[in-house]
Design a protein with these regions (language model features):
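Flexible, acidic/His-enriched mid-domain "rim/lid" segments that flank
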Residues: 8, 85-185
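Terminal domain-start leader segments
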Residues: 1-59, 94, 155
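Short secondary-structure junctions
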Residues: 23-26, 182-186
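Short amphipathic alpha-helical segments
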Residues: 43-45, 72, 109-112
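Residues at the C-termini of beta-strands that transition into short coil/loop
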Residues: 54, 63, 80-83, 101, ...
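Short, polar loop motifs at secondary-structure junctions
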Residues: 35-36, 61-67, 103-108
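Short, structured coil segments at secondary-structure junctions
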Residues: 53, 72-75, 115-117
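Compact, glycine/acidic-enriched structural inserts
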Residues: 60-88
Length: 186
């Protein structure tokens, strides 16, 4: 698996900040914890939270810090044992904490509030949707690469794997294995 280039991650953060400024003027902080959005911004999926402010972005990792550092070209990755550490770093809490409300659970929002004591939750769902709507050159290249993997596995390899007596489960396992060996995330 090839790491997402640092320049791509930085461009995504810059676009996020610009859209937040347009849609939520005066915003102070956004918290990303959903794995897909986390991968989009950091290039890795670990347990923790990405906290984005207009002036900085820090990826706080609870587990697998070393893995995060090895997989990601994100500029600021820090270990944390508890959200208390991240909250202490920032000092005062923002009035509105922006989260991905379509994905954030009420339990997670309550836990975040316990440590950051913000007054209300705001949604950056529309920002994320707008951001991911237009693909970068890197994203288009990755889509083409993914398509090539699928084409090879489904058009070239799958016909060779199919034989009398193979179960659907066994075929799925073998196809999945072929995809992952070629760089698919599965």
């Amino acid at each position: 698996i090839r790491p997402v280039p640092a320049s791509e991650l930085e461009a995504r953060l810059e676009k996020f900040r610009r859209l937040m400024d347009e849609m939520h003027p005066g915003w102070e902080m956004a918290a990303v914890n959903h794995k897909i959005a986390m991968y989009y911004f950091t290039g890795t999926m670990q347990e923790g939270v990405l906290l984005i402010r207009p002036q900085d972005a820090i990826f706080w990792v609870r587990r697998n810090y070393e893995r995060a550092v090895n997989e990601s070209h994100f500029s600021d990755i820090r270990p944390m044992h508890s959200f208390r550490e991240a909250a202490a770093f920032y000092g005062s809490a923002p009035r509105i904490m922006y989260v991905e409300t379509k994905k954030a659970t009420l339990d997670w929002e309550r836990m975040l509030h316990k440590y950051f004591a913000f007054e209300e939750v705001g949604s950056f769902d529309a920002v994320l949707q707008e951001l991911r709507l237009r693909k970068s050159a890197y994203e288009l290249q990755q889509m083409e690469r993914s398509g090539a993997i699928h084409e090879t596995v489904l058009d070239v390899i799958a016909p060779k794997l199919i034989h009398a007596g193979i179960s659907e489960a066994q075929l799925a396992i073998e196809l999945y294995s072929e995809m992952v060996q070629r760089g698919s995330h599965g």
